[in-house]
Amino acid sequence: RGIETRPYVLGGEVTHGDSLGNEGVLGAGSVQWMTAGSGILHQEMPRGNAAGQMHGFQLWGNLPSTQKMTAPRYQDMKSADIPVVTDDDGTRVKIITGEFWGKRGPVDGIAADPQYLDVFVPAGVKKTFRVDTYRRAFAYVFEGAGAFADASGPQGVLLEKEVAGQEVNIRDLSGNRTLVRFGTGDEIT
């Protein structure tokens, strides 16, 4: 109760079902956004790809106290439904939620209105993203190698409690993919 879960499948599949009658299979590049709210029974079973490998993320979010007892809700977005924008330098951004570079991600009606992005920065490129004045940032390099200017965590991880109105710089070391989340709410600790 009182949470949101956000599985993002990069490789393999996740079979899922819940007490509201939602069921299906999340394939590579797909995302699910489940708001547990007042309560839901939910199950997931990962299945590897042809090589038996499963790769992805499962982020959990705590709903604001005023929304803890909201009605349960489920959104399943296939990879083809998630927009990808490409900059002149080859940087590609898959927009799962929020608005970025003039496009909006398909997941909507989310408690904290986050930006949730899958960012590819090509080798030799340094990319700067401006953070809205009311957001905090979390980023993790999960493929290749990269670093963040002035990051508070180890190389490849950015964990910033206060980035509002600042810039997040992703510096490539060998071409990377980075999971980025800008959001509101309690401090990240």
Describe each region flagged by the PLM.
Residues 1-189:
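Jelly-roll (double-stranded beta-helix
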